[in-house]
Amino acid sequence: MRRPMVAGNWKMHGTRASVAELTEGLSNLALPSGVEVAVFPPALFINQVIDGLAGKEITVGAQNSAVQPEQGALTGEVAPEQLVEAGCKLVLIGHSERRQVIGETDEVLNRKFAAAQAKGLKPVLCIGETLEEREAGKTLEVVGRQLSSIIEAFGVKAFANAVIAYEPVWAIGTGLTATPQQAQDVHAAIRGQLAAEDAEVAAKVQLLYGGSVKAANAAELFGMPDIDGGLIGGASLNADEFGAICRAAGN
């Protein structure tokens, strides 16, 4: 039985004051015990959030990490080693904004994935298609290629210690959302691709949906058999809204 997971990606939002307010709101939530809850604050606020959530069942992760596991001469980056020391347990790899805006390639993301696992960080691999790719009927081709990049480099068992988030690029921050059935179809294809390599890994890996998830649509999305929770963007910046999404996952 896969444990539901709800992860909040705060992206490049927050000041010291607003992060303190959000963290306090999260610490006061009554969260369902069966749901794995995580937040990914900007790197500058990771320590503040970890301190503010001390004693709470909320995991803190990083939005990005370096291509090498250890600290060293790599200006502007944060090493997995450093994130682990700070208290992080998870790291986002390949979010569409990193792929589309920063230009990170599958090769770069493979290195980040491996570096994170080498230091005990669990990667949350983000995959998904653009609107143009969906309209061209290439959704499964694109998602399959992004998944295959990791499988070919490290083997499918790399996903025994990873999470996968399907996030259609056209549904991120646009207000557009894949229908529950559209999302389920892609999630089923992802799980099927993994199962062709290793049925046990496929059955256990958590598959999250990301793309304008909010309290109003979370329950219907999370009710799909291959959707194990969500990677939440804007709605995670409101503690009450995020709490409602977590409760939807618990149901």
From Swiss-Prot:
Q: Where does substrate bind?
A: N9, W10, K11, G173, S212, G233, G234
**What's one GO MF term for it?**
triose-phosphate isomerase activity
Mention any one GO cellular component term assigned to this protein in its UniProt record: cytosol
The active-site annotation reads H95 (electrophile), E167 (proton acceptor)
Listed InterPro entries: Aldolase_TIM, TIM_sf, TrioseP_Isoase_bac/euk, Triosephosphate_isomerase, Triosephosphate_isomerase_AS
Q: Tell me the domain of life.
A: Bacteria
The biological pathway it contributes to is: Carbohydrate biosynthesis; gluconeogenesis; Carbohydrate degradation; glycolysis; D-glyceraldehyde 3-phosphate from glycerone phosphate: step 1/1
Q: Which GO terms describe its biological process?
A: gluconeogenesis; glyceraldehyde-3-phosphate biosynthetic process; glycerol catabolic process; glycolytic process
- Just give the chief location class: cytoplasm
Keyword annotations: Cytoplasm, Gluconeogenesis, Glycolysis, Isomerase
Disulfide bridge positions per record: none
Q: So what EC number does this one have?
A: 5.3.1.1
Alphabetized PROSITE patterns for the sequence: TIM_1 (PS00171), TIM_2 (PS51440)
Membrane spanning residue stretches? none
Q: State where the protein is found.
A: Cytoplasm
Q: Kindly indicate whether the keyword Cytoplasm belongs to this entry.
A: yes
Quaternary context = Homodimer.
Assigned protein family? Belongs to the triosephosphate isomerase family.
Q: NCBIfam families, from UniProt?
A: tim
- What name does the UniProt record give this protein? Triosephosphate isomerase
Species of origin: Pseudomonas putida (strain GB-1)
Q: Which gene encodes it?
A: tpiA
